[in-house]
Amino acid sequence: MKRIAWGITGSGDLIKETYDIMVDIKKKNGIEMMVFLSKEGETVLKWYHMWSDLQNDFPDFKKEGGPNSPFIAGPLQVGHYDALIIAPATANTVAKIVNGISDTIVTNAVAQTAKGETPIFILAVDQKRGTVQTISPQGKTMNLKMREIDVSNSEKLAQMENITVIGKPSDIYDILGVSKD
């Protein structure tokens, strides 16, 4: 059985799609998932009316108390988990990782995991230049203009050791080697 650590940041963009895929993977494949949230991850899940879903689908999830609380970096670093997935990752999270700042549970998990051999997969939401469409908490389509600095940081992230940037939520099926059907 595979063990996956899944970190959720404060990104509303791609949160619903990512969440649905992770639930599908858990239900169909029996993959053990340890879910942890940044403080803003909690805020966004509540704003998108997904908080009760999380409580039902992943009842043992962990909320950030500080950069190393709850303690998850150690088990990630020593290979207790087969992969660390951060999805979706905000521009703020990506900027911190790229600049070596590990002051949240998510950025600290990435920094410490990168020192070991556990692979890290990050779904950075700001990867493409121009305007992208996303869904608001009210279910309406809205356009977001990507800032050059955020796209540039996503490109830098892709060059970092032991980190793979994934392009879309459905790529998670492929990295875990599970079927979409």
Residue ranges and their predicted role:
Residues 1-181:
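A cross-family phosphate/adenosyl-ligand binding-site feature
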